[in-house]
Amino acid sequence: MHNENQTLIFEISKEGRVGYSLEALDVPEVDLADVLPANLVRSEAAELPEVSELDIMRHYTALSRRNHGVDSGFYPLGSCTMKYNPKINEAVARFSGFANVHPLQDESTAQGAMELLYDLQTSLVEITGMDEVTLQPAAGAHGEWTALMMIRAFHEANGEGHRNKVIVPDSAHGTNPASATVAGFETITVKSDDNGLVDIEDLRKVVGADTAALMLTNPNTLGLFEENIIEMAELIHSVGGKVYYDGANLNAVMSKARPGDMGFDCVHLNLHKTFTGPHGGGGPGSGPVGVKADLIPFLPKPVLVRTEEGAYHFDYNRPQSIGRVKPYYGNFGINVRAYTYIRTMGPDGLKAVTEYAVLNANYMMRRLEPFYDLPYNRHCKHEFVLSGHRQKKLGVRTLDIAKRLLDFGYHPPTTYFPLNVEEALMIEPTETESKETLDAFCDVMIQIAKEAEENPSIVQEAPHTTVVSRLDETRAARTPVLRYQKA
């Protein structure tokens, strides 16, 4: 039996009901008012739910059944790389030596953990073609900002603090211009050409003596490889700027091509995406930043180094460093999972990851091409972007298609992004899905396309089988109710 109207845990609370019992107090009782300032002592008890253990288990188990994750179903969320997270990663992350280590304990007692971090840095240096890596940033956008702050420090150290422009393509992730703004730069947008790639001629028009950097994802958010990357890098370098690599799409080129060999000066990675840290629930993530030699002095400190004696040490003596960007040394647990993944796969395995990710995306694209518009009809990399323009003419929007997918148990693709594709549907299958899964999803997408032609109302009014139908998203955004208030 399924309770369609799931109550809040506060609403099943009954005064005096408890889930656990404690032993009788065997030490002198202390009055909080005697040991805490008066302003820190509550005048009345906090309104916390009073429930039994059984109530708790049933409540959260019921909620868990409403969640969708990669362990429960296909998750083709474009530009998010929702691949399966191997459970060996979880087992290793739970080793007592990793799970119980504390960032403030003496370095001499944490050499094993530090060795893992150092080896992970070394692996990421090899994968990216950079010269040094910091594991400090907590996630992707944090890595972007960290890299931009290093670029800013580099220019200022060279007496070129006037460089205040960061160039981003019109297909860029929204975090790129946001990170540039937070780092104190002005964003300049460069257009895409008819092939979905950066328009070189438009790029020539916007570069100049005030150019600090070009931010680029390769392949880009259309799933297309920027074929002119060498020319673009040379152009930016010719005016004294730096070229930054957004690692969101590294899954498409891993062990096939390296950002450092393409002319990039720095790169951020998403270990929670490409290297199988669980994600989708708001964190934790890991966004390491790799740099070429001339940016090494500006890395966040402390920098993890290995001494001549083979010991591992956090080096704080970095006078040009941009300083800490996160307490302690990054999200250690995610780094352990990424290290486990890299060691499990090896170079050949990582190469196969890329090959299957690209194969799966191209297979799906060709199966769906007859039923949806394909703005850029060419081989893609790890993801591709369809357009619901054809369906829009029939009164069915991309949003409707996404909602209809829920009826079949699928998480929808990314919708309405990139912004330069009308009614966009961005699909990324990843390498971990079978042909059977891809076919089943494509069959549903084809069915929805036919429904848009023959019975559009069933798509327009979807979803029909979920616990809740369409929410008033505008009202939710403008007047959010973020905490429980007793009636």
From Swiss-Prot:
Keywords: Oxidoreductase, Pyridoxal phosphate. Transmembrane segments: none annotated. GO terms for cellular component: cytosol; glycine cleavage complex. Its cofactor is pyridoxal 5'-phosphate. One of its GO terms (molecular function) is glycine dehydrogenase (decarboxylating) activity. GO terms for biological process: glycine decarboxylation via glycine cleavage system. It catalyses: N(6)-[(R)-lipoyl]-L-lysyl-[glycine-cleavage complex H protein] + glycine + H(+) = N(6)-[(R)-S(8)-aminomethyldihydrolipoyl]-L-lysyl-[glycine-cleavage complex H protein] + CO2. Coiled coil: none annotated. The modification N6-(pyridoxal phosphate)lysine is found at residue 273. It holds the Pfam family GDC-P. Its EC number is 1.4.4.2. Belongs to the GcvP family. C-terminal subunit subfamily. The glycine cleavage system is composed of four proteins: P, T, L and H. In this organism, the P 'protein' is a heterodimer of two subunits. The glycine cleavage system catalyzes the degradation of glycine. The P protein binds the alpha-amino group of glycine through its pyridoxal phosphate cofactor; CO(2) is released and the remaining methylamine moiety is then transferred to the lipoamide cofactor of the H protein. This is Probable glycine dehydrogenase (decarboxylating) subunit 2. The gene is gcvPB.
